[in-house]
Amino acid sequence: MGEARAVRGTREEPDVIVEAHDLWKEFGRVDALKGLTFGIGEGSAFALVGPNGAGKTTTIKVLMNLLQPSRGRAAVFGVESRAISPKELALIGYVSENQELPGRLTVAEYLAYLRPFYPTWDRTLETSMLRDLQLPATRRIRDLSHGMRIKTALVCAIPHRPRLLILDEPFAGLDPLVRDELVGGFLRQAGELTILISSHELSEIEGIATDVGFLHAGRMMFQEPMSRLTERCREVYVTLNATARVPEPLPPQWLAARAVGNVLMFVDTQFSDESLGELVRTLCEGVRQIDAKPMTLRSIFTTLAPAARDGAL
């Protein structure tokens, strides 16, 4: 499936403030982005997921005008990223895994340096974030651990009350306790921000995201609300009579199918109670029991990634 599939909810559609249309990025003979198309509505938390090399960081860099697209259109707040100005940048907070921070300054000194650039800077919010994330304001940034530097970047990205917060692999290399602290502090302070987050830590994303886009080999395989994705993907166990045979071929929406003894297991990517039972009993003889279990974002991703690689999506 080469084009993104947008699955919309029943709520009133928000304004799209981040968008890409037929976006391509070439590095020599390598196409990092291949006709990428998607949009992010204001007030949503959009998780950009995909395997290493899928193009997640490249997408973010094009949106931020850190890379020029080879062709196509990328825009933030309706302004093409090629023409993004300090006015638009002032409405964006940005945190990345390898973000450069001035190591010679203390946390407090760096915050004091940033404040004059943002008339909307909220000192009360800054203070509460320093407290919640337990950041040592008097320590030099170069002396902080990796986790503390990521926390510092987050405290620098939110107090000016941006409309859009971009997080590029913010949890990479952090131990579970620091990740939990970071996610907890972030969720308390994010408010009504629009968020674009790219991360391999899918369990953390699941607690933040309202929408998800699955990127593979530079293409958006699908884009939809998180609630819809977790509703339509179920792990299914079909118990058959001992003499029953598993039919072939199986429906294309049944991924990662395997049989263990008299139990057929698969992931149904178009699940509904009524259609699953009807389809299973039509295809399989001797059906004794059908069980469908919810899946985490991580388990969905580990099923969809190989399917995308093999051209099964």
Residue ranges and their predicted role:
Residues D180-F271:
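ABC transporter nucleotide-binding domain
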Residues L105, T230-C233, L304-A305:
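Short, flexible helix/strand-to-coil boundary loops that buttress conserved ligand/catalytic motifs
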Residues T120, T138, E192, Q253-W254, ...:
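A generic structural signal for alpha->beta connector loops
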Residues H21, G41, T239-N241, V267-T269, ...:
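A structural detector for beta-sheet-dominated domains
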